[in-house]
């Protein structure tokens, strides 16, 4: 298996479009250009930001309510801003751009990029106000390129792309099989099995390829390809109730192709968010073709897995066993949904495909960051390992009991995602007018909490540069405490619209980290923080090399 880090030049992407698209974009840029109060054309970035007159007013700052138009912004022309992003290749550093802009403009600002317009916030008290206004059917920004792919290919949409009552009905059914405690107890042993197999295979490799040391063997590798295989193997085991054999000596080429397609899909999404995807589809723009082809591969691979699972479950039914299989046998989320019969097969297919596509990079990449941080923080590593060993002994090797007795494992995942959130924003469209930082924000405005600057803000965290899983057992912890005291850990979203695969991902990462810490000591050659890039998810600029030493 290989891990491809795709970071295409977005500006090259638009150059590959037809002349008519470029001309249309340029016309819209010229028409959208406006003059700021200072008498200059609004730019983008520190040198061109446009703060409100008098600076931003905080909540309770003694100023009267201010108009929406007075919110500090990065430039009035979305198309001009977008071209500057392309020319300066800012998409891959969008998280850094957000951090710099907050440092310049204060805790709230507006931004227009192409067709998108958002209000960006980062303080927990403001995020609390936003989530209080999300309503019964919370909405987040629709990834229009994904939706256009479903529509042009006539695929049904899963809950990720739905809104309103239809979203809520489907989501409640999925919660029972993916989020609730009984569901977690059913699939936890499957995740544990894959995590144990991963560590056994890694131990064999370390002893075979590594150097002999006084206490055992040691091997330095880039673990990212193995972590991607682990993530796909684990998620498929939970979704379909069977292994797909990615730990064999000759893993499936189809599965490797699937992983590559997921990365290509993620890499081509950001530039398409700010352009009209249906127009690009009609014109056959190269950027759109790459994106759609990646999704086609994802759907094709998932369809084969789903069809295989459906045939297996129907054979079991014909034999009188029901979709649930033999007594006590877990047949995966696919089998559970089919057994309940409350979702059509087409909707099951749409949601299983979304879960499968969303379950690879979003767990493999945080695991890279977690292993690196443990390697460059040996004292933290020993602290977590000590708690894990004690919990493992008390639980008699029972994974569920061990996780319950090792809260630092959960803190380790939360701390990793604080510094390196997979998705760098969480959006909502308030159903009523709200006031944030003394600014009036109309209902229906896209407001997004920016997680990367949130996790590194000194106004929110003590010593934010320090990697400290133990901080989540203190007063800093919480995801929804009253008065905005929580809302510091939002990597999986919040409330009814949080990530539907959250419990799978959390337990998958905690279990693998637990077994790695029980088996290996980790070290790295550098104590520097990893450089990062944004390709719809945050990931290392270069995958880190980790030294695994047997205990």
Give the positions of each predicted feature.
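Cytochrome P450 substrate-recognition site 1
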Residues: 51, 55-89, 94-190, 194, ...
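Cytochrome P450 heme-thiolate "Cys pocket" and heme-binding signature region
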Residues: 474-509, 531-535
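Cytochrome P450 heme-binding "Cys pocket" and the immediately downstream C-terminal segment
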Residues: 378-380, 502-539, 543
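N-terminal mitochondrial targeting presequence
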Residues: 1-67
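Short, small-residue alpha-helix embedded
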Residues: 362-374, 512
């Amino acid at each position: 298996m290989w891990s491809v880090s795709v970071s295409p030049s977005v500006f090259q992407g638009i150059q590959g479009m037809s002349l008519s698209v470029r001309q249309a974009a340029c016309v819209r840029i010229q028409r959208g250009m406006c003059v700021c109060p200072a008498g200059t054309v609004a730019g983008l970035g520190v040198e061109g930001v446009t703060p409100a007159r008098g600076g931003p007013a905080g909540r309770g700052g003694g100023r009267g309510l201010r108009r929406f138009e007075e919110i500090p912004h990065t430039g009035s022309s979305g198309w001009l801003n977008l071209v500057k992003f392309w020319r300066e290749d800012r998409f891959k550093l969008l998280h850094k751009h957000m951090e710099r802009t907050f440092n310049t403009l204060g805790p709230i600002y507006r931004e227009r990029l192409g067709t998108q317009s958002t209000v960006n916030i980062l303080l927990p008290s403001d995020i609390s106000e936003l989530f209080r206004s999300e309503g019964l059917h919370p909405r987040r920004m629709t990834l229009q390129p994904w939706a256009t792919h479903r529509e042009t290919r006539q695929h049904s949409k899963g809950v990720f792309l739905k809104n309103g009552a239809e979203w809520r009905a489907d989501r409640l059914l999925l919660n029972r099989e993916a989020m609730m405690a009984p569901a977690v107890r059913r699939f936890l042993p499957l995740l544990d099995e894959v995590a144990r197999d991963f560590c056994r295979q890694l131990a064999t490799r370390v002893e075979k390829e590594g150097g002999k040391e006084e206490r055992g063997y040691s091997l330095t590798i880039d673990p990212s390809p193995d972590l991607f295989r682990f993530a796909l193997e684990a998620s498929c085991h939970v979704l379909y109730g069977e292994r797909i054999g990615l730990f064999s000596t000759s893993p499936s080429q189809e599965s490797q192709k699937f992983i590559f397609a997921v990365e290509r899909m993620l890499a081509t999404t950001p530039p398409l968010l700010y352009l009209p995807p249906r127009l690009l589809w009609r014109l056959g723009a190269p950027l759109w073709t790459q994106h759609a082809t990646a999704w086609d591969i994802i759907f094709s691979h998932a369809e084969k897995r789903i069809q295989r699972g459906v045939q297996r479950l129907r054979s079991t039914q014909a034999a009188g066993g029901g979709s649930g299989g033999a007594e006590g046998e877990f047949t995966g989320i696919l089998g559970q949904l089919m057994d309940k019969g409350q979702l059509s097969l087409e909707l099951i297919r749409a949601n299983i495909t979304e879960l499968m596509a969303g379950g690879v990079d979003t767990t493999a990449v945080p695991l890279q960051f977690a292993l690196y941080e443990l390697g460059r923080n040996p004292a933290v590593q020993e602290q977590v390992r000590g708690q894990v060993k004690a919990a493992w002994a008390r639980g008699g090797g029972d994974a569920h009991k061990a996780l319950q007795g090792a809260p630092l494992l959960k803190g380790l995942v939360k701390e990793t995602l604080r510094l390196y959130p997979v998705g760098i924003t969480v959006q909502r469209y308030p159903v009523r007018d709200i006031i944030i930082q003394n600014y009036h924000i109309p209902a229906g405005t896209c407001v997004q909490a920016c997680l990367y600057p949130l996790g590194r803000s000194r106004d929110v965290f003590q010593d934010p540069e320090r990697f400290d899983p133990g901080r989540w057992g203190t007063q800093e912890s919480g995801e929804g405490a009253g008065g905005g005291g929580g809302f510091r850990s939002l990597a999986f979203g919040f409330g009814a619209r949080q990530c539907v695969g959250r419990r799978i991902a959390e337990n998958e990462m905690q279990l693998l980290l637990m077994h790695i810490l029980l088996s290996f000591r980790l070290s790295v050659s550098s104590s520097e923080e990893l450089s990062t890039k944004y390709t719809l998810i945050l990931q290392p600029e270069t995958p880190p090399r980790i030294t695994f030493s047997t205990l």
